[in-house]
Every structure is written in C-alpha cells, then in structure tokens.
C-alpha cells in the first residue's frame, strides 16, 4: 500500500498545477495564510536542497523537525524531480538563485 496523500501534498500539488492561494484555501478548507506558509516552507526546503544542505541541517536552519523536512523532500521528489524544474519553480515564485546553486545529484 502506498503513502497517504497529506494536506501538504495536496496544497503543493494544487499550487504546482497553477491554482492560486485562494483557490487552494477554498479547496482544502485551509486559511490562505496557512497555504502560503506551506508553500514558503516548501520553497525554503527546495532552496536548501539545491545548495546541498543536508536534511538534518535544513531542519535546524528552518526551525522544523527532521520528519517534516523529510516529508517535504518526499513531496519534492514526487513533483519536481529535476533540479532545473526546481529552479524554474523557484524563479516563478520570485526567488533568484545563482547558477552554482544547481544541485545535480
């Protein structure tokens, strides 16, 4: 049996499909600020991944537990498999990354 879809999975999937924060909030019965918080944490995990920051250190930097960071990493691997796709996502979100931030492995 596979992994269960969490509200984080759903929120991020809807975002990656192009839905707005308000649309996601309505569909998931979340406050728009909560939706934005999930997306902001997801972006932060992506950035740290692209800079090759180990998950345990990312947890410390972001002030979240290692299990939460692992969950975001799983979501990241499910939806944004290629580092270029990760960079494109972050660029679309207004994040400017230098070329050397590209994680290739």
Q: Model regions: which residues?
A:
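Long, charge-rich, low-complexity intrinsically disordered regions
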Residues: 1-105
